[in-house]
Amino acid sequence: MVLVKKYFLQRSMTKVMVDEYLAKQFYNAEYAGVEIVKTPIGTRVIIYAGRPALIIGKGGKTIKQLAQMLERYFGLDNPQITVTSVENPELNARVMAFRLAIALEKGYHFRRAAFITIRRIMNAGALGAEVIISGKLTSERAKYEKLKEGVVYKSGAFLDKIVDRAVAIAMLKPGVYGVEILITKPMKSVDKIELREQPKGPGENMVTVTNVSFIEESQKSGEQK
């Protein structure tokens, strides 16, 4: 039993180490995540990115070097690497965090870049988005700026399935800027309330609301007469 636990623990640690390495190595490629699947003939590695061409490289040179690196330093047996694009990058917190960090490094104003990021996320259909940028934004003293739109859940059941969270860093002359993005996915949540449409037929399942005070005044005037 101990060996089984050790095996799964070691496999999880390897995935985390590979994920951190790929995030640093392919920062500009808008790296989104990785899946590692053990097969009878080797190890299948699926890399998700917003710009897959930067990971593949010219003539597949970069991906061949990456396969050698994964086998030598991370112990992956005969890695077969597949690079695929993210289906909806605007709803992937990691992709948007890297995009925002790259924009800050290019010289965009932090508030303008954050507004553009939130607008793109909401236009993609997200229920909510939150962007937090921290660092020496306007002075020598570090502070943070938070922008939020829509509904962003911070606790509750199935939080990891409803909200996508990612962090990134941007290296600037004043220092290091931290970027954190939270995206509420476009899915039905537990606290969502839907109102039924008004029935087409007249008088069908309809409730008429009458002004009660008007009825009481009419009754009093009738009694006085």
Curated annotation (Swiss-Prot):
PROSITE patterns: KH_TYPE_2, RIBOSOMAL_S3. CDD domains: KH-II_30S_S3_arch. One of its GO terms (molecular function) is structural constituent of ribosome. The keyword 4Fe-4S does not apply. Binds the lower part of the 30S subunit head. Belongs to the universal ribosomal protein uS3 family. This is Small ribosomal subunit protein uS3. It comes from Sulfurisphaera tokodaii (strain DSM 16993 / JCM 10545 / NBRC 100140 / 7). The gene is rps3.
